[in-house]
């Protein structure tokens, strides 16, 4: 059985983390169980000040597919993403935000691109960052450039 590590960086996501998990589990059951593919959920709490970590711990108690990392303070989404990549154990690794801005169902299309089409990597790319605070956009762009320079994997901004 193959496993997909779904890395979920979280910062004050108490209003969305349970909804995200429910939708991701539905996708796993309906679209991946028939393929004999399982999920590992790796939530990375980036120093949330709300009940995000408490909710993640509750998910962990009920589901052995859930793992988590908890930061002592807010280090930023990029640090959470990196910690997730360093601790993922699946055959495939992906990242999804808990706010469901990118639907978990797109994972099936991405998986098919790797398995059926033979790609080494597949990425979804946000075409525009419209409406996002300028500092967040600058930070995200800097992260993608850094990863591009430090790794053999090309990461396009917005991916």
Where are these regions (language model features)?
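Acceptor/aglycone-binding surface of glycosyltransferases and processive sugar-polymer synthases
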Residues: 58, 65, 71-73, 77-87, ...
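A conserved acidic beta->alpha catalytic loop
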Residues: 42-53, 100-101
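Short beta-strand/loop segment that forms part of the nucleotide-sugar
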Residues: 8, 32-47, 69-70
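Residues at or immediately flanking beta-strands
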Residues: 3, 36-40, 65-68, 154
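N-proximal low-complexity "stem/linker" segments adjacent to membrane-targeting elements
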Residues: 1-37
């Amino acid at each position: 059985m193959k496993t997909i590590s779904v890395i979920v960086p979280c910062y004050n996501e108490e209003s969305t983390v349970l909804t995200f998990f429910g939708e991701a589990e539905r996708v796993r059951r309906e679209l991946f169980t028939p393929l004999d593919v399982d999920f590992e959920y790796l939530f990375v709490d980036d120093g949330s000040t709300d009940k995000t970590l408490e909710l993640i711990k509750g998910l962990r108690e009920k589901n052995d597919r859930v793992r988590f990392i908890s930061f002592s303070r807010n280090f930023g989404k990029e640090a959470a993403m990196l910690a997730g990549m360093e601790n993922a154990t699946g055959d495939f690794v992906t990242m999804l935000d808990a706010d469901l801005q990118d639907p978990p169902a797109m994972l099936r299309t991405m998986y098919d691109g790797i398995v059926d089409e033979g790609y080494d990597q597949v990425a979804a790319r946000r075409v525009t960052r419209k409406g996002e605070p300028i500092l967040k956009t600058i930070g995200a762009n800097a992260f993608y450039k850094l990863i591009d320079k430090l790794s053999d994997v090309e990461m396009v901004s917005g991916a």
